């Protein structure tokens, strides 16, 4: 909120009309999950009124309000999601997101020095990259862009350049076997050994975890032997204690024989629309 006010003052000093807004002033409505809230709706009327008066609206990008008027925060990358949601509501032709990098790269340039910048990438591929650990654009921002058909361009705040365009369809990328590689560290693998292989078991395990706003990533269920199976899934390390408590509570209902926890694992993912049509 302070930053948006300061930016507004800086623009005024340059003779540019601007006005800062908090989430409550704009009515960015979210779920009530503090620090992990999800945007439900954005009231675009006030934004459009300001734009019609040739004034630049500057909006805090990581906040929201519940139906009851309580302030929430959107978590890491929440400003990306806010920007795309607002762009969708005001029918913008495109949403530009300025970051500390020059665009979307084939992999993390901080890890691989010869990573190449992509001129364009499809929404589908960007969703996969973001979901598998690429941190340039937040996953929910790409989901909004895909749902409301808002092209997104990722640009550098520090360097001039064309950045990377995230579009609904990019003909030049369709034949690319692999368009990017993403990695996620600090993952935890949970394995419930010898779970009853009966309908509804997965829901009984994952349902309470979902209600706790924990995102489950990889899910693997082994082939059943004598009516028993091993159920494995991964979550972020920051959610480890929450998941442990949940599995302890439902142990008698699920009736698993043993809980095996493997912390500090990493995942590497290859993403590319071209792999869909490739064998092997």
Label for each model-derived stretch:
Residues 21-23, 155-157, 219:
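Conserved beta-strand termini and adjacent loop/short-helix elements that scaffold enzyme active sites
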Residues 1-142, 222, 234, 260:
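Nucleotide/pyrophosphate-binding catalytic subdomain
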């Amino acid at each position: 909120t302070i930053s948006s006010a300061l930016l507004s003052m800086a623009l005024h000093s340059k003779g540019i009309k601007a006005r800062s807004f908090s989430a409550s002033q704009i009515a960015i409505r979210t779920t009530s999950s503090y620090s992990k809230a999800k945007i439900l709706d954005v009231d675009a009327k006030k934004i459009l009124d300001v734009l019609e008066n040739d004034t630049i609206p500057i909006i805090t990008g990581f906040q929201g309000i519940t139906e009851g008027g309580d302030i929430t925060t959107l978590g890491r990358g929440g400003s990306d999601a806010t920007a795309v949601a607002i762009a969708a509501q005001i029918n913008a032709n495109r949403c530009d997101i300025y970051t500390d990098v020059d665009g979307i790269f084939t992999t993390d340039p901080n890890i691989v020095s010869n990573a190449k910048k992509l001129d364009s990438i499809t929404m589908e591929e960007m969703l996969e990259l973001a979901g598998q650990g690429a941190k340039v654009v937040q996953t929910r921002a790409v989901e909004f862009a895909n749902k409301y058909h808002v092209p997104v361009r990722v640009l550098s705040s520090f360097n001039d350049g064309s950045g990377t365009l995230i579009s609904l369809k990019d003909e030049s990328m369709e034949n690319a076997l692999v368009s990017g590689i993403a990695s996620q560290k600090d993952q935890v693998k949970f394995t419930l050994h010898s779970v009853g292989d009966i309908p509804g078991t997965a829901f009984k395990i994952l349902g309470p975890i979902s209600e706790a706003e924990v995102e489950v990533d990889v899910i693997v269920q082994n082939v059943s032997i004598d009516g028993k199976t091993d159920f494995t899934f991964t979550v972020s390390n920051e959610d480890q204690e929450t998941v442990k408590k949940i599995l302890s509570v439902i142990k008698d209902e699920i009736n698993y024989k043993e809980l095996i926890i493997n912390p500090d694992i990493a995942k590497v993912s290859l993403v590319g629309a071209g792999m869909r049509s490739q064998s092997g």
